[in-house]
């Protein structure tokens, strides 16, 4: 199951970034929807908790990535005309797909809080890749990447702690 989840998220990630580069949200929505349906069909023993975690992640992602835009660190392609600082749909899809891996592909990180924070510090690598594909532009590079690293470390740690809480119910 881990291999399928990893491959599935890789497809979701590339679809989301390509969606941003093309400004077409359908390119992100369809693969993410299929991936999550397959994911939910596999995790039937803790389906409710997985859905709750992904919903929380979507809200967190909306806040975090919208903050990056509002603060002028990142300019995303594919945003809504009437809300240009709101994180675009393709970013939200990416958060949902990413979070589906926490209790599966990333299960080895559960309880390893320093390692989780370290992985969060590596988040700028994904933004660099997305920028290279044309999905976003990162401004004021050092400050932006520093802020992204810290925000992702906190976000990733929070998602793992929330997951631990939900899965213990």
Where on the chain are the PLM-derived regions?
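Aromatic-rich, lipid-facing transmembrane alpha helices and their immediate juxtamembrane interface loops
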Residues: 1-169
């Amino acid at each position: 199951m881990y291999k399928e989840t990893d491959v599935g998220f890789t497809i979701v990630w590339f679809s989301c970034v390509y969606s941003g580069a093309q400004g077409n949200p359908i390119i992100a929505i369809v693969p993410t929807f299929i991936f999550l349906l397959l994911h939910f069909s596999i995790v039937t023993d803790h389906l409710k908790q997985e859905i709750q975690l992904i919903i929380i992640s979507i809200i967190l992602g909306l806040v975090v990535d919208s903050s990056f835009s509002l603060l002028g660190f990142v300019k995303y392609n594919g945003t809504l005309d009437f809300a240009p600082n709101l994180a675009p749909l393709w970013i939200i899809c990416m958060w949902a797909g990413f979070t589906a891996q926490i209790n599966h592909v990333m299960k080895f990180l559960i309880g390893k809080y320093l390692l989780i924070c370290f992985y969060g510090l590596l988040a700028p690598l994904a933004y660099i890749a997305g920028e290279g594909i044309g999905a976003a532009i990162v401004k004021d590079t050092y400050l932006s990447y520093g802020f992204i690293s810290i925000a992702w470390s906190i976000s990733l740690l929070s998602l793992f702690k929330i997951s631990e809480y939900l899965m213990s119910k």
